[in-house]
């Protein structure tokens, strides 16, 4: 599914990743652990296509395609989901509106019919019940006024709705209380199957 070959990356002239090789196959959950500043988040951002990094050498092959040639939107549409360590707040945009737009964009890219409002809300209800989330999550502005734990729960909610082939959790367990961590762990369990894979970036062993 994902294979990183001889990857070297620098930021502002400083080498962060040197000659990295990594393989993630279907059905696997791979954890990458290390202290702050060791390049963990750099790796997740490079896979997702975030700007600001220079790839000096190497390839990132996802489903037999070198995704370094794709922009971030194409990488997401091809089945890569990055749950951010610090999810962005967007006041004025409802969580449900953002999610439906993102979901239907991916469906359209892959040649599938877009979900109508009814089908979308039914799916939201099923997923939110799995995670024990309050109905108000959908109507609130995207991450605006959310606590740190609520933002992380929302990332997991979006992950289960989007159904990506590869999910990257970038220190999503950082700063969470026990109850929030339980919801994250349940989300990971619901997501896991033999058809997808997960890359977990963390410096804790608890998740």
Protein language model regions, located:
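Conserved hydrophobic segment flanking the Walker A/P-loop of ABC-type ATPase nucleotide-binding domains
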Residues: 24-26
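ABC ATPase NBD Q-loop/coupling interface
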Residues: 59-75, 143
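ABC ATPase C-loop
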Residues: 159-160
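Walker B catalytic motif
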Residues: 171-172, 179
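The feature captures the beta-strand-to-loop junction immediately N-terminal to the Walker
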Residues: 33-35
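H-loop/switch region of ABC-family ATPase nucleotide-binding domains
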Residues: 201-203
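Q-loop/switch helix immediately C-terminal to the Walker
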Residues: 86, 92-108
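Conserved structural motif at the start of ABC-family nucleotide-binding domains
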Residues: 2, 17-19
